[in-house]
Amino acid sequence: MSSNDVSPTSPRVLFVYYSHTKQAQRVCDAMAEVLRGRGCDVSQAQIEFTDPHYAKNFQTFPFRHAVFGILPLLWPQLRRKTGQIRIPDEAKAGNYDLICFGSPTWFFTTNMPLRSYLKSDEARTVLSGKPFAAYVVCRRYWSVNLKEVRKLGTAQGGRFVDGIRFTYEGGQIRSLLSLLSYFGKGEMRERSLGIKIPPTNLKPDFGDQAKEFANKLADSLAPAAQVGESASSPAGAA
């Protein structure tokens, strides 16, 4: 369904996310395609991290240094600090029927750019009285991230409806080596420090998982979103 096929009564859905490695963006794109196919008017808003204390390390990918590029964020993240961001116009105001947040995990919890948005006046304007969902993209740690998004969104007047996680392959040590290798090289490698490592980033079946969850969200907007093909089975909440 094209934007020309959207009617004035189509459900309006907003995605707000941060994505430096483009993994959260890939999930957003996959879900947005499904929701548009179900007759929704979908807006996608990517938060930009502009804080002068950290932004220089996030201007390019891969990082100049896989560890020291992100290490300055450890203490601020553990203290749940906010930072300067640029908010797209779509996420500043609008009468949306559903808002969905995409949140990569940074040091166990919600990344600073999305946290900063969720604590903003703009988020309160968008969320007040509205249902919202969230998806977490992470190596392993997802639950604290999802709980924080839920807590912050609810505090801004939103009503949490569902959440899901997209995790990477591998155990604790090997998945960390894979991610750091990708941060530093910008490409998948089979070994790091002489150790065989699994692929990092989203698993090959993430698209099916995203489609199922998006269809579940579309079903929650019924009957207005009963356009196109509905989900065959519900997605499990994270």
Task: Tell me what each language-model feature is.
Residues M1-S103, F108-M112, S116-K119, A123-S128, ...:
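N-terminal beta1-alpha1-beta2 submodule of the flavodoxin-like/Rossmannoid cofactor-binding fold
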Residues T60-H65, K151-L152, L179-Y182:
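Short, hinge-like loop/turn segments at secondary-structure boundaries
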Residues L98-G102, K130-V136, G194-I195:
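Short acidic, glycine/Ser/Thr-rich loop/turn "cap" segments at secondary-structure junctions
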Residues T110, W142-N145, F206:
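Conserved donor sugar-nucleotide recognition element shared by glycan-biosynthetic enzymes
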Residues P131-S178:
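Short, glycine-/small-residue-rich phosphate/pyrophosphate-handling segment
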Residues T167-A238:
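Glycine-rich phosphate/pyrophosphate-binding loop and the adjoining helix
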